Each structure stands twice: as C-alpha cells, then as structure tokens.
Amino acid sequence: MAADVPGSPLAKNATTEEALAWYKSQYEELEQELKEFQQSSKELEAELEKDLDAADKRERALQQKAEGLSYEVEEWKRKYKESKSEANAAQSALEKEITALRETNRTLQLKLRDIEVANDDFERQARNTSSSLEDLESKYNVAIERAVMMEEEIKIGEQERERLRVEAQRLREELSDLKIEAEILQSKLRKHQARGHLTQITTTIAPAPASPLSTASSPLVSTPPDTKSLSTIDTLSEVQDPPSPPMSDASLGKGLRASRSTPVKQTASRPGGCRTPKTSISKSAAAKSSAQATHKANQSFSENNITPKPKPLSSSTSSQSNRPSNGRFNTNSYPMVRTPSSRPSGARAAERPRAPVHRIPPSNSLTHIRTLTAQMQKLEARVHSARSKLPATAQTPPKQSPRFSGGIGGLAATVAMRGKKQRGVGASTSSLNLLDDDNASDISGTHSNPDFRSSTLNLSKHIPRLSTSGVSRIAFGPLPIRHPASAAASTTSTSTATATNVDSEVSRPSSRASSSGYGRPISRADSHSTAASGYMPSSSSRPISRTSLPGHGTRTPVGSWPRSSGNLSAYGHGPAHSQASISYSTAEEDELTDDGQRELRSKTTPARRRTGTLSARDAPDHHHTGIPIPGSGGNRRQSGSSSASRSSVTGSLSLRRQSNAAALGHGHGHNAGYGHGHGTVPGGTTVRKVVDLGETY
C-alpha cells in the first residue's frame, strides 16, 4: 500500500491542495480496502464456523467411536484374559494327563516285557512237555510191544509146558507098564534059575579095598557085585545092595534098553542083588537066555533103525573095572566129572581081583551091549567136543549157598556120621502115599532087586499133583547150586537143558527138595544128601539161554529158570553111602527123548550103590532140572552124559529134547530116588520098604 500511494505530499514542491487532494485520495482507498477486508473477514468467519461445526461434529463422532472402541478393547481384554486362563488351565491339565499317560505307558511296557518273558518260559515248558510226552509215548509203545511179546512168550511157554506135562504123563504110564513087564520077566528068570542052573556057587572072595578113583560103574553094563555070604548081605545090605545103573543110561533109545534087558534079569535074579561068582552053567540054559535077550535086542533095534557095530570087548572090560570091588565109594575123592578122560585105564582094571575062574558062556546080547558101550563112549566124546562150541550166556553164575561150609569132596562140618546099619528114609518130594510094611513086603516078595522093587512101588503109587494156587510161581534168577559133583560135565552135557525147561518153569510150583531159590529153605532130604556126600555149592557154571539153541530166536525172560519135579535126595549112611530118593510130578516132569527111554529106566541093571545122589539142580549147570546127576567120587566113568549121543543113536531128536534127556541121564541109578526101609523076603534077600515123606507147597 505504501507503493500505491503517490509520493508523499510533503514533498517540497507539493501545494496544500495537492497535499489535501492526496490525503483524500488515500483515505478513500483505505476505506475501500477496509470494506473489502471486512467482507472477506465475514465470509472467512462463516466458513470457519462451518468448518468448526463440522470439526465439532467430527470430534463428537470420533469421540463416540473412540469410546466404543475402548469398550470393545476392554471387552477383548477381558475375553483375552479369560481365554488365556482357560488355556493355561487346559494346558496344565493336558500336561498332567501327559505325565500320567507317560507313567502308564512305562508301566505297560514293563508289564509287556514281563509277559513276554513269561510267555517264553511257557513256550519252553510246552516244548519240554511235548518232547517228554513224545518220549513217554514212545516208551509206552515199547512197553506195550514188550508186554505183548512177553504174553506171547508166556503163552508159548504154557503150551510147551502143557505139552511136556502130557508127554511126561504118557511116558510115566509107559514106564509103569514096562516096569510091570520087567517084573514078570524077572520072576520068570528067577523061576528058571531056581531049577538048578545057578547051584554051583563057589566060595566067596573077599572084596578088594576101594580105589579112590574108581567110583562109578559102566554107563551101559553094570557088573555084578562082589560075592559075599548071605549073612554078610543081611548085616551090610547098605554096602552090598546095588542100586540101578545111572539114570544117564535112560538117554538111549528103545534098542539100547531092550538089548540091556538080559543083564538086568540076570543080575536081578541073584539073591539080594549081591554079586556072585561067575559059575559054569549048562550051555543049553545059557543059549536059551541069550537067545531070548538077542531076540528082544534085535526087535528093538529094528524098531529104532539102529545097526549095532561089533566092537572089541575091551571097552566093556575097562568100563567094568571102574566099579570098586567092595561096593563102596570114596566121598573124599574128587567130585565125579562125567568126561571121557575120567575113565580109568584098562591096566588099572586088570590089577583088580577078579571073580573065580568059573564063568558063564558069553551071549550075543552081552556082545551087543558091550558094542553099544564102545559106541556110547565115542558118541560122548563127539558130543563134548560139539557142546564146547555152543555159545554161552551172559548170565552171571549163581552165588554159592551159605548153607554148606565143607570143602569139595568132604562132609559138612555140622553133619554127624551115621553107623553103617542106620537106615535113613529117602525123602520123596512127590505127593505119594505112604506104603505100610505089609504092602511093601507083599510087592517086594516078587523081586530080588530091592532098588528095582522100590522104584516100581513108588511109581505105581504115584499120584499126579498140579499146582492149585492158580498163580504161577516165578523164579527170579538161577538157582544156587548145592553140589559141584558134575561141574566139569554139566557145562557141556546139560547146558541145552536149561533153555528147554525155561518155558515150563514160569507156572511150575517148586518142590521142597529142590528149593534153592529165594525165600525157600532147603529140604531135609537135600541137606542130608549134601552132608552125606560132602558136596558144596559151586558158582562156576552158567546156564545157557534159549537164544543159543537152534530154532529159538526169542529170548526167555531172565530169572525164569525152571524148577523140576524129579529130585534126588539122600541120607548119609556111613562114610560114603546114601540111599537115593526120587519123585516125579505130573506137572513138573521134564521131557524124555522118546517113548522108549522109560523102558531103560524101568529095566534097571543092579549095580553097586552109588553115593551122594543129587538133585539135578544141585549140579553146577542143572539149576533147571530135577533129574539126578552123578554123586561124589573121583574120576568116575562116563554114563551117557551127553544128550547129543542119544540124538546120534535115535537119529532124529532135537537139541531141546536131548537136553531134557541129558538131565535125566545124569543120575546114579534108574530107581535111585525112592525111599527105602528094611525088610526081608524068603531067600535072605534084603528088602527096602518104600516110605514117603510127602510134599507140601
């Protein structure tokens, strides 16, 4: 504005009018500017008011909005706090739950581990149980099979036992018939000789002293006893009365028995069975008796298809020399061993005192007998060599019985010797009836051989007896051996008999005389026999098993060794004499080789009494049989100790049957085994009365 204003009027050449006029013009301009300024100020004020109102409105709205937002903020804060607290609570709860779950998981893991361990144990136990069950099942099956096999074997044994019993009964009946026939023949021979053929009896010769090595007679030919007066016979009948030949003679066939019938009748016809000097008789009588014997021998040989081969007579001479001249036996000598080497030589026999020069003319039957004697010697040697090759069993030998303390061949220390005239009663183990004196005298009156007569009585009065208990009595091992008499021969001659009788033993009752098993006392008869004979148990033998026999593949159960019924027992009579007793039971009879073997046992040849009669089970290898075997005495002659020799003679016998016959063939005499008493018949003959002690199971 200062620029628009004209120069100041106060300029030196400006007049008052100009100055006025300038002032006036300035004023008007200023006023105009004021009005415009006022107007513009009003407009601006109005606009500012409007703006202020609008700002107020906006402020109020914003304030309301801020208040609402603050409220919302508060709400959200509250909600946030609530949700946060809830989240914290949930988090803490979840954390606690997680902790519990972790603990639970750990516990479950431990339990699972224990369960797995237990499961492993259970699985192991299950495997063990299954394997044990399989083993048990296999063992059970094996046991069942074994039981079935044993039942079959027992059935077979029962059948064999029944067959043997029937066979033994049949053989016993035939033996009784043959004894009756022999009795008739002997009576006829005595009547024939009583007519004057034996009237030239010369003076007797004193018997020579007994030899310690010659204690057995010939197995087939028993020489007559030495001659003594009838008074001496009556007083010393136990010395002079000869028993029958050893039962091993029964191992021959019918032909051998028939051929021996003549010596039986000749010797039995002499008074008292005593040896008489050989006298000269008429040739016609000798021819007649020899013709009868030859006819019977030839007939028997034709039945058995046996052709006798003539041999020199030296064999019978040497065999006869084995008999002691005085009829006694030395019990202190070596126990008799039935081996061919035990026979005395012929030179020793030649040194013996002989009978008077008067002799009976030789007969064909005697020649046959001597020939058969030589054949038997050869067969015995062959059988011994054959049996030595048989396999032996693995069975331990039986233990020695503590009942006897005496040495071999000597008497027991606790046994008192009896006098020569004391006559013991042979204890028969079978259930026979006692025979009174009248019956014994009546029956024995028809016999001059008391041994033969007593055997006939005892067998004729035999009553078969079976076990009524209904339960089989089984032996649990080999029976102890009472006598060592046949220790050397029994291992070869009777080893096969063991296997044969095994089947029959399972259900066989034991007898008192053969009781040497467990829990059974020894019988009185066997104790006396052992004491009198001086035997002692032996444990040097082994029984043979059935597997070693041909045709028998099955093995017999261990411990079932049979006890047989035929048992020998004896009482002591003097230093070396005993009387034998034998019994037979139907259910316990061992099998003979054939039908004719009992004929040989029935037709006994009188010979000297042999000492120490044994039960067959008393021998080392005879646990299984009751057939008698040789007694004491050293180097006694063999008497058919091999069962194979009978097989060679008869031709078709099996080894099993031979073993039973071998057991039968080891006795002292055929009729050794019957109780004897005293008695006399007309003619001064000493008669033994049969007495039986009976048997109790």
UniProtKB/Swiss-Prot annotation:
Coiled coil: 11-195
Highest taxon listed in the record's lineage: Eukaryota
TM stretches of this protein: none
Pfam family, one: NUDE_C
Keyword Coiled coil attached: yes
Keywords, comma-separated and alphabetical: Coiled coil, Cytoplasm, Cytoskeleton, Microtubule, Transport
Compositional bias (Gly residues): 670-682
Gene3D superfamilies for the chain: 6.10.250.1080
Gene Ontology terms: cellular component: cytoplasm; kinesin complex; kinetochore; microtubule
Compositionally biased intervals (Polar residues): 226-238, 259-269, 327-344
GO MF: microtubule binding
Annotated localization: Cytoplasm, Cytoskeleton
Main localization, broad class: cytoplasm
Annotated segments matching region Disordered: 204-364, 388-409, 486-686
Stated family: Belongs to the nudE family.
Assembly and binders: Self-associates. Interacts with nudF (nmp-1 or nmp-2).
PANTHER family per record: NUCLEAR DISTRIBUTION PROTEIN NUDE HOMOLOG, NUCLEAR DISTRIBUTION PROTEIN NUDE HOMOLOG 1
Reported function: Required for nuclear migration within hyphae during vegetative growth.
Protein name: Nuclear distribution protein nudE homolog 1
Organism: Neurospora crassa (strain ATCC 24698 / 74-OR23-1A / CBS 708.71 / DSM 1257 / FGSC 987)
